[in-house]
């Protein structure tokens, strides 16, 4: 059909909208997108119908765009693949910002396909029209404003624009944003566009991207053998932040070969014989002992422990190496350092092959004894059901291959202070470290991993993302949400906020519990009254292919008082 014949048809614009959407999605598929998250909307009809027509895409839906963004974030986090997101125009787009900001800091690859009014309807009083141009600003790796589909622009431009942004994302990570202007009509019959598509006929006949990018040099791990072997003869520490699943094993082997202490953040996916360092580093003798180290090798970023960050910032470190696959600055202490961008597991394996016996192997073994004595002290906190006893005991409750999601605010800090976590895939949103979107993120991880999962979060976090429980109604593996309900923001009990305004303006007690929320979404619910009962209910829930909420109710302020008492005891104890 000729272009003149096409434009004479009443609804050709609707068909052209869908054609452009189909071209975009097909090229995204060829560039590695397998899953797409869609919220309802009329302006996004072309993208939605194109997704349905593409049998290489798995579709996930949610009625709330903020939750949808975090759902996609969870899928991308767990699969380590790009995930597409489709929303309609207006504030639907703005609701993606929290998830986009998180991905901007932690590197998950989101492909945002936002629908927009045509440019002539922006800032003129038209309905559901806001300024969406570059709305995510510096939080995204690339932004492209896709004009209203027109036969005057070759489909080759559209495909090559997709390829350019996706190639940039492959190198830098984070979200990329295509803002797509769709004029009405949005609904119509198919039209023959064969003449218009002639310039990309070869592309249509294969399954390759329109533009194939190749690096001149294949990426490889390069470590200066002489420099590394000199470094390994020092007193060093191996610090581990956020890791991808299955990377901890290689890092642990390297630390063992070096004979250096291994300090693991909760996001690392396990614990070591030096666990509890966030607390025992408050003991002056222990702190002084660790400060003998003049070398730090850090794998992964986003460290939770303030005490560990203070050690990095203030100790007399001569050599600080930070290895992470993501680009950008990841050292908030601004130390002079060697910043290595590389896959962590591969780099650790390469370093291990170059590592000889270290002169100072085992130098920090006394700190293992410190850790043992510290955990003996925690025994007195294990007889009652409290947030502290939950954090102390949780690791022992989890069957093999049960994965973890750790919420923000108080709970992840408690696990860092007193927990011993099992070796398992462990996830968290520790970029912006917000309490929003945690349930939706858990749902996304669950969809990608298809493994039993326990998510731990606080009551305010659950209230913040309550409607995302809808995403957990239909699961194929056990999902257990353990919510610690201390009636508000318990983290503020540990911060020097004004005492007179602590409740009213910081903790904000709500007086709510979650049994009715569980019932509303058809989820199982337990509220244990003792620590053994909590363990029993958790273990049972992990045998059921459904979602269970376990609510741990504790008095407001209790956790803060217990932590302060523990800190005082450890500071004054003889641990070395």
From Swiss-Prot:
* GO MF assignments: 2-succinyl-5-enolpyruvyl-6-hydroxy-3-cyclohexene-1-carboxylic-acid synthase activity; magnesium ion binding; manganese ion binding; thiamine pyrophosphate binding
The record's listing under InterPro entries reads: DHS-like_NAD/FAD-binding_dom, MenaQ_synth_MenD, MenD_middle, THDP-binding, Thiamin_PyroP_enz_TPP-bd_dom
Q: What does the cofactor field's note say?
A: Binds 1 thiamine pyrophosphate per subunit.
State the Pfam families in the record.
TPP_enzyme_M_2 (PF16582), TPP_enzyme_N (PF02776)
Question: Is Transferase found in the keyword set?
Answer: yes
Q: Does the keyword Metal-binding apply?
A: yes
State which Enzyme Commission number(s) the record gives.
Answer: 2.2.1.9
| Reactions mediated catalytically | isochorismate + 2-oxoglutarate + H(+) = 5-enolpyruvoyl-6-hydroxy-2-succinyl-cyclohex-3-ene-1-carboxylate + CO2
What CDD domains does UniProt report for this protein, alphabetically?
TPP_PYR_MenD (cd07037), TPP_SHCHC_synthase (cd02009)
Names of required cofactors: Mg(2+); Mn(2+); thiamine diphosphate
**What are the alphabetically sorted keywords of the record?**
Magnesium, Manganese, Menaquinone biosynthesis, Metal-binding, Thiamine pyrophosphate, Transferase
- Spans traversing the lipid bilayer: none
Task: Extract one GO BP annotation from the record.
Answer: menaquinone biosynthetic process
Q: What class of enzyme is it?
A: transferase
Q: In which pathway does it act?
A: Quinol/quinone metabolism; 1,4-dihydroxy-2-naphthoate biosynthesis; 1,4-dihydroxy-2-naphthoate from chorismate: step 2/7; Quinol/quinone metabolism; menaquinone biosynthesis
Its quaternary structure?
A: Homodimer.
**The protein's name:** 2-succinyl-5-enolpyruvyl-6-hydroxy-3-cyclohexene-1-carboxylate synthase
The gene coding this protein: menD
């Amino acid at each position: 059909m000729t272009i003149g014949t096409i434009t004479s048809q009443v609804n050709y614009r609707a068909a052209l909208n869908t054609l452009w959407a189909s071209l975009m999605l097909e090229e995204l598929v060829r560039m590695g997108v397998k899953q797409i998250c869609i919220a309802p909307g009329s302006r996004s009809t072309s993208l939605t119908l194109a997704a349905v027509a593409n049998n290489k895409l798995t579709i996930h839906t949610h009625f709330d765009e903020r939750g949808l963004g975090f759902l996609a974030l969870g899928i991308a986090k767990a699969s380590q693949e790009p995930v597409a997101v489709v929303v309609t125009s207006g504030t639907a787009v703005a609701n993606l910002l929290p998830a986009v900001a998180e991905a901007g800091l932690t590197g998950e690859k989101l492909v945002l396909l936002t629908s927009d009014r045509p440019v002539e309807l922006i800032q003129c009083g038209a309905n559901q029209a806001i300024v969406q141009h570059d709305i995510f600003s510096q939080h995204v790796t690339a932004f492209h404003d896709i004009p209203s589909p027109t036969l005057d622009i070759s489909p080759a431009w559209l495909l090559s624009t997709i390829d350019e942004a996706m190639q940039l994302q492959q190198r830098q990570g984070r979200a990329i944003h295509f803002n797509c202007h769709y004029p009405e009509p949005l609904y119509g019959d198919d039209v023959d566009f064969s003449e218009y598509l002639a310039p990309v006929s070869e592309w249509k006949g294969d399954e390759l991207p329109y533009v194939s990018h190749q690096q001149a040099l294949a990426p490889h791990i390069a470590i200066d053998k002489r420099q590394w072997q000199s470094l390994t003869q020092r007193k060093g520490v191996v610090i581990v932040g956020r890791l991808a699943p299955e990377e901890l094993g290689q890092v642990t082997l390297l630390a063992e070969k070096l004979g250096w202490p291994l300090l693991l953040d909760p996001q690392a996916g396990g614990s070591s014989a030096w666990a509890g360092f966030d607390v025992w580093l408050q003991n002056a003798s222990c702190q002084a002992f660790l400060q003998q180290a003049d070398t730090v090798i850090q794998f992964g970023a986003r460290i939770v422990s303030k005490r560990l960050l203070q050690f990095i910032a203030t100790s007399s470190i001569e050599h600080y190496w930070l290895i992470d696959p993501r680009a950008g600055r990841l050292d908030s202490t601004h130390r002079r350092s060697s910043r290595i961008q590389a896959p962590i597991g591969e780099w650790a394996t390469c370093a291990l092959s170059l590592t000889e016996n270290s002169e100072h192997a085992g130098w920090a073994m006394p700190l293992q004894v410190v850790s043992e004595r510290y955990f003996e002290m925690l025994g007195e906190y294990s007889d009652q059901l409290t947030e502290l006893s939950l954090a102390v005991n949780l690791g022992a409750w989890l069957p093999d291959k049960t994965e973890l999601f750790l919420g923000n605010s108080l709970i992840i800090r408690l696990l860092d202070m007193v927990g011993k976590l099992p070796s398992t895939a462990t996830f968290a949103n520790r970029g912006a470290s917000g309490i929003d979107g945690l349930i939706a993120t858990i749902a996304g991880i669950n969809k990608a991993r298809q493994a039993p999962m326990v998510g731990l979060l606080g009551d305010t976090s659950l209230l913040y993302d309550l409607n995302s429980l809808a995403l957990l109604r239909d699961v194929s593996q056990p999902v257990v949400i353990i919510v610690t309900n201390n009636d508000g923001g318990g983290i503020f009990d540990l911060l020097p906020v004004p005492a007179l305004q602590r409740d009213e303006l910081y903790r904000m007690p709500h007086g709510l519990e979650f049994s009715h929320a569980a019932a509303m979404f058809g989820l199982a619910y337990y509220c244990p009254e003792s620590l053994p009962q909590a363990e029993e209910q958790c273990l049972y829930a992990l045998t059921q292919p459904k979602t269970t909420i376990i609510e741990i109710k504790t008095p407001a302020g209790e956790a803060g008082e217990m932590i302060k008492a523990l800190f005082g005891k450890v500071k004054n104890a003889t641990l070395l």
